[in-house]
């Protein structure tokens, strides 16, 4: 029975995971969330670590998968490894769900410690509610604010208000910054290296 699963295509990280960090533990490494799908609903899986920098799908698609209630509501600790060089992305990942976000470039000892002793999520930590998540994912797909308001059956000014609230929580200066962030989150690794 696998209790810890790492999703990564980084061979160095996968090797370190198996041989140095948690050797002898019941762990597995998969190159994608799709390939690990059969493991994700197992009741004995306690830790899911997703390397957001090496995903073969977009980060936003991965977050959609990880936000599913069957994963979030059963006590599974979900860790997202991300580059600390992009603070806006780190804030977005923290707000996207009940995830523990860890800087990807930590050395071995702090990295292992972060996984062994998960931090308690602050009661005041902002999470995107379902409606705000729909607004953000619709914006990422290129829909206009008016169209989003129609789809959600909300007045336009309510959509603008909700979006501005999320901008403040993320510490972004304006909507254009959010659009750029969402664009980066919709790119997969192949598009980022072109």
Language-model features, listed with the residues they occupy:
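N-terminal regulatory/sensing modules of transcriptional regulators
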Residues: 1-119
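Short alpha-helical "packing" element that flanks the helix-turn-helix/winged-helix DNA-binding module
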Residues: 132-139, 166, 178
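Basic, Lys/Arg-enriched C-terminal extension of HTH/homeodomain DNA-binding domains
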Residues: 167-194
